[in-house]
């Protein structure tokens, strides 16, 4: 059976498991191996082998949380199952599961508290650390949204004013900002040289509005969508061009805060973008 497991020989593995159960039907280990794939099987295992059921209770908790056991979501039953899991083995995995199930229920404060408990077992190179950060960000999502909206406005103002010191607060050396301008020319890497390049656009006004923020599930990336209105003249001309665009931007979470890595602009609502180079 071990050889079949190591070599990935599924047919031999299942035959060995069947033979083993026929010879030793009360083996907790062999019954555990045969329980996979169905939450109700894990529940049966926890009843048949209660002294060896820490891992089974952990899986049963997910069965309740997903509504796979009992036909409806039952977070209270899930937590009771995890309590039983911890009574048999007081390790980090059950705390990690409690955190994940609290997150499923939308309680990110309790999720983070339990994730801290799991993290305390092994803080060095801990596999529990990333979710700890995720739960903190979910718990503080409103504040992060507010800060990202402000950052997008500040970044755009820094670009318009060619304020390199301010601009550098919102980008990272680890990943170049890639932009697509509203003149619909090719995408390009927006560098310090791009920031300081002179052009003949004279802005009368430029305002962002209706900024919306969405996050990736792990809260490491944010997608901002928004609109921009304003007007400008070009060169010595006094003709005013009405500027109207829709845009999106990608921000990533780094060790130094949220940084912009992509922006895409396009004319919107009958207005114009910036002139072609």
What are these model-derived regions, one by one?
Residues 18-22, 103, 108-124:
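TPR/TPR-like (Sel1-like) alpha-helical repeat modules
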Residues 29-35, 49-87:
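Alpha-helical adaptor scaffolds
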Residues 2-9, 26-27, 34, 38, ...:
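Glycine-centered coil turns and helix-coil junctions that link the paired helices
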Residues 133-173, 177, 274-277:
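Short, low-complexity N-terminal intrinsically disordered segments enriched in polar/charged residues
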Residues 164-217, 227, 241-243:
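A solvent-exposed, acidic/Ser-Thr-rich amphipathic alpha-helical stretch
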Residues 244-274:
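Short beta-strand edge/turn micro-motifs at domain boundaries
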Residues 25-32, 53-56, 91-95, 120-133:
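Boundary/linker segments of alpha-helical solenoid repeat arrays
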